[in-house]
Swiss-Prot record:
Keywords: ATP-binding, DNA-binding, Metal-binding, Nucleotide-binding, Repressor, Transcription, Transcription regulation, Zinc, Zinc-finger. This is Transcriptional repressor NrdR. NCBIfam families: transcriptional regulator NrdR. Belongs to the NrdR family. One of its GO terms (biological process) is negative regulation of DNA-templated transcription. The gene is nrdR. Residues 49-139 form the ATP-cone domain.
């Protein structure tokens, strides 16, 4: 691997560790030319399916968009970042487990709702109200009744 400081090809790994989740490796490297140290991370390259929108348009799966959609209903809710990160990983794992080349946006929304329901009921209701286009109070009451 090239040194990010001097561009030399002569670097060596001086330490490797697997992260807590077991899905990536952290490597400390040293450049033999300039003697500077740097860290790299190795993860598996996963090909996520394309998302098929309700209008039939297809777009690449976007983790940042997923994070934004997931965290918006959690705004001002007492949910630790670790829970959010874990839930987002669960969502990605569920998508990958399907083994499909495409996923319907509505199916992705249902998976997001399941994860929100598991970590924060208020966020779940907030998301459901937008995702399912609630029209009146009865729609909210139906979802709240289903929580019990």
């Amino acid at each position: 691997m090239k040194c990010p400081f001097c561009g030399a090809d002569d670097t060596q790994v001086i330490d490797s560790r697997v992260n807590e989740e077991g899905d990536s490796i952290r490597r400390r490297r040293r450049c033999n030319a300039c003697d500077k140290r740097f860290t790299t991370y190795e993860t598996a390259e996963l090909h996520l399916p394309q998302v098929v929108k309700q209008n039939g348009k297809r777009e690449e799966f976007n983790r940042d968009k997923l994070r934004l959609s997931f965290t918006r209903p959690l705004h001002k809710r007492p949910v630790p970042t670790e829970y959010v990160d874990r839930a987002l990983e669960h969502i990605v794992q569920k998508i990958l487990a399907k083994g499909e080349r495409e996923i319907m946006a509505r199916d992705l929304g249902e998976i997001v709702m399941q994860e929100l329901k598991a970590i924060d009921k208020v966020a779940y209701i907030r998301f459901a109200s937008v995702y399912r286009s609630f029209q009146d109070v009865d729609d909210f009451n139906d979802v709240i009744r289903d929580l019990d």
